[in-house]
Swiss-Prot record:
InterPro entries named among the record's database cross-references: HMG_box_dom, HMG_box_dom_sf, HMGB6/HMGB13
UniProt protein name: High mobility group B protein 6
Compartment list: Nucleus
Keywords: DNA-binding, Nucleus, Repeat
GO molecular function: DNA binding; DNA-binding transcription factor activity
Keyword DNA-binding: yes
Species, as recorded: Arabidopsis thaliana (Mouse-ear cress)
Bias (Basic and acidic residues) ranges: 240-254, 354-363
Pfam families: HMG_box
DNA-binding interval(s): 138-206, 255-321, 379-447
Residue ranges, compositional bias (Basic residues): 11-21
Amino acid sequence: MATNADPAPTKKPRNSRKALKQKNELVETPPSPVSVKGKSAKSFEQDLMEMQTMLEKMKIEKDKTEELLKEKDEILRKKEEELETRDAEQEKLKVELKKLQKMKEFKPNMTFACGQSSLTQAEQEKANKKKKKDCPETKRPSSSYVLWCKDQWTEVKKENPEADFKETSNILGAKWKSLSAEDKKPYEERYQVEKEAYLQVIAKEKREKEAMKLLEDDQKQRTAMELLDQYLNFVQEAEQDNKKKNKKEKDPLKPKHPVSAFLVYANERRAALREENKSVVEVAKITGEEWKNLSDKKKAPYEKVAKKNKETYLQAMEEYKRTKEEEALSQKKEEEELLKLHKQEALQMLKKKEKTDNLIKKEKATKKKKNENVDPNKPKKPASSYFLFSKDERKKLTEERPGTNNATVTALISLKWKELSEEEKQVYNGKAAKLMEAYKKEVEAYNKKSAATTSS
């Protein structure tokens, strides 16, 4: 086997000593132990200072985190309280909803009398018109002039075939005026007979209507009373149901029921457990288990506090009951006083009413006496210009339009008076002025005569 041959020795260069010398010059001299000690002390102080600043920063951060945690705990606690109150409100709403759902509706059991009219006013009027059409006795009788016109109409139309309704009416009107009293008599008698029959029927109907109205009013009153009784019974039943189902509203002044020994202990422990971020349910469970495991000796101070609370509660309740009784008595007295006051006011009002009624009666009596004592010979005040015109026109209109009601005639007269010119009105104004002059003279004469009689 062939072995590797050792390398041939190389010759050192001549300038190697110079290079070593330069190398040695470049290498640093080792530091002295004193200088090393000083440097290490300085670096330790710096490290210590840095550590202190770091610790301070960490403390500040810790405080900040603690504050943030506290804030978060407070927010969580508030949210829990809000949820609790919301749950309580929801429960209340559910209870109220159940109450409303269970609440009865007022359904009256009414049997309306057959006498009570279910028709509306318009339907009633329609029925009355139909009744008048079917029954000729209920129709208003035609006047003697209209009866005569009916008899003469065909004859006049034969004589004047080209005449229209107005012309025919005018011809008949002229003929009626020229008729003697004997010729008019049979038509007037016929009209009187029909009028009497009509008045009898109307009087009977009116009496029947009045009787039916009285009956209807009586039935309505009875129905209203029955309805009121039913409603009052319904209200009473509803109140009784509410008394059974619902508790009375709490009085804010009423002393609160004392807490038990367990609740005293639980209230004491709650704050500490809440600091540990325990929920309300967890707090309740923990305090319950702790209370069970407590010995009688440890329970004793809490039971002592509970007993003391109960004693103070009983004393407060006695005081509360006493004040309530006093309030009830004072309220009763106030109500009695108020009732007396109302009675007094009512009596005063009644006296005033009686007084005014008596005054009205006296006034009426004095007026009646004055009217009785009026001298029949005393001149009467003359008619006005409009009244004179109205008198003339009424006569004309009744002849032209027989059977027209009084209200329509009055309205027509008023319209005609407005349509008159000043010259036309002057005729009636002159007549009224003459009558007024004559009236004044008569009054003067009357006054002189009455003065002479009184002096004698």
